[in-house]
């Protein structure tokens, strides 16, 4: 039987983009990268675990903020090069800016405008154990 991880078309860095969506509303919460280990751990632990390119290590979503993403379903696109994670976003904050979604700006009249409010000050999220 073929290993399910071998079916994925990893990029030259051994990564695949992963889009996290709210499992109830379908809203796109964020995009991050996954490597083979993080995707296998996500499936095993039923929570989103990404690969942080900037830190060069596994990133268990919510490990610092408490805003864990509980996995409900994973999907692979037709080209096998993008993953969608259908998640329950604990705390209703996916973005490090304190917003529900990382996609909080909309293009209007030739400019990017912020349309989603900050739900919690990022300084309060990432200080003294959330």
From Swiss-Prot:
GO terms for cellular component: cytoplasm. Keywords: Amino-acid biosynthesis, Cytoplasm, Histidine biosynthesis, Hydrolase, Magnesium, Metal-binding, Zinc. GO terms for biological process: L-histidine biosynthetic process. Catalyzes the hydrolysis of the adenine ring of phosphoribosyl-AMP. Belongs to the PRA-CH family. Homodimer. PANTHER family: HISTIDINE BIOSYNTHESIS BIFUNCTIONAL PROTEIN, HISTIDINE BIOSYNTHESIS BIFUNCTIONAL PROTEIN HIS7. Its main location: cytoplasm. Pfam families: PRA-CH. It comes from the Bacteria. This is Phosphoribosyl-AMP cyclohydrolase. It catalyses: 1-(5-phospho-beta-D-ribosyl)-5'-AMP + H2O = 1-(5-phospho-beta-D-ribosyl)-5-[(5-phospho-beta-D-ribosylamino)methylideneamino]imidazole-4-carboxamide. Binds 1 Mg(2+) ion per subunit. Zn(2+) binds at residues 78, 95, 102. The keyword Phosphoprotein does not apply. Mg(2+) binds at residues 77, 79, 81. It comes from Pseudomonas entomophila (strain L48).
């Amino acid at each position: 039987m073929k290993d399910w991880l071998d079916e994925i078309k990893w990029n030259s860095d051994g990564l695949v983009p992963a889009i996290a969506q709210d499992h109830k509303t379908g809203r796109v919460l964020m995009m991050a990268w996954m490597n083979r280990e993080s995707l296998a751990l996500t499936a095993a632990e039923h929570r989103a675990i990404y690969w942080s390119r900037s830190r060069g290590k596994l990133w268990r979503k919510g490990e610092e903020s408490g805003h864990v993403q509980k996995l409900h379903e994973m999907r692979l696109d037709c080209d096998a090069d993008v993953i969608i994670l259908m998640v329950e976003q604990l705390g209703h904050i996916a973005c490090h800016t304190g917003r529900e979604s990382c996609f909080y700006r909309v293009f209007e009249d030739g400019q990017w405008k912020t349309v989603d409010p900050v739900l919690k000050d990022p300084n309060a999220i990432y200080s003294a154990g959330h």
